[in-house]
């Protein structure tokens, strides 16, 4: 399928976008867009819109997306797939695109019984389907509600990756590249590319 990938440094970062392309390009193609208004036909040949992760305040949403807000909403409401990773997952929530049915998107580090209260990069212990993984995390989100398919969970059992119909959201970074793990405490947790396959399988789950 063809994926429209939003990029705006640093909030929806090139680093995350590059990892997404690396993980998915064996089966999917891409076209890019940013904060400038797209043409009315931009989404006509697109199957999925993707908002990656990055750095900064999620509340920059209004500035960055205002010219394409209606086009994205229309695309998803008409069955187009939405993939959100970290920042992109936050943006699916009720304060932003408001795409979800009775699901709140919130910071994992502020939830009860979390394994960390610090947002800095770490290899987060998660359970992805039936397997335990250490996945790159940078102040990612979790999801509160019942109307979702849970693909992965944090160690406190809060959802980390979910699917609701045509919407797929991930709090951690399966698209992370090897250089993201350059700190000594992260080096042992480089996934050797296995998380790319998890992301590819996840995207292929979307209805």
Language-model features: locations:
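Structural motif
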Residues: 48-54, 167-171
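N-terminal beta1-alpha1 cap of cysteine-dependent amidohydrolase-like domains
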Residues: 1-46
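Extracellular ligand-binding/catalytic regions of CAZymes and related secreted enzymes
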Residues: 73, 96, 174-207
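Short, solvent-exposed loop/turn segments at secondary-structure junctions
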Residues: 10-11, 55-57, 89-91, 104, ...
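A glycine-rich, often tryptophan-bearing local segment used as a flexible ligand/cofactor-contacting loop or short
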Residues: 57, 61-125
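Hydrophobic/aromatic beta-strand patches that form the interior of the parallel beta-sheet core
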Residues: 31, 83, 98, 151, ...
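Short, well-ordered alpha-helix to beta-strand connector turns
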Residues: 46-47, 79
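Catalytic beta-strand/loop cores that center a nucleophilic Ser/Cys/Thr
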Residues: 117-180
């Amino acid at each position: 399928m063809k994926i429209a990938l939003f990029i705006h440094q640093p909030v929806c970062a090139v680093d995350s976008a590059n990892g997404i392309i690396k993980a998915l390009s064996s089966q999917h193609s891409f076209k890019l867009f940013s904060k400038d208004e797209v043409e009315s036909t931009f989404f006509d040949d697109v199957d999925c819109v993707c908002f990656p992760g990055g750095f900064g305040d999620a509340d920059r949403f209004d500035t960055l997306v205002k010219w394409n807000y209606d086009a994205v909403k229309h695309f998803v409401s008409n069955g187009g797939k939405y993939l959100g990773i970290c920042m992109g997952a936050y943006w699916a929530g009720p304060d932003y695109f408001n795409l979800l049915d009775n699901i709140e998107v919130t910071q994992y580090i502020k939830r009860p019984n979390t394994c960390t209260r610090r947002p800095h990069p770490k290899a987060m212990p998660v359970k992805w389907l039936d397997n335990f993984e250490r996945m790159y995390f940078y102040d990612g989100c979790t999801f509160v509600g019942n109307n979702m398919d849970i693909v992965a969970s944090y160690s406190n059992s809060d959802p980390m990756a979910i699917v609701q119909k045509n919407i797929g959201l991930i709090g951690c970074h399966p698209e992370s590249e090897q250089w993201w793990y350059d700190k000594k405490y992260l080096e042992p947790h480089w996934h050797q590319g296995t998380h790319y396959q998890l992301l590819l399988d996840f995207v292929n789950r979307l209805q």
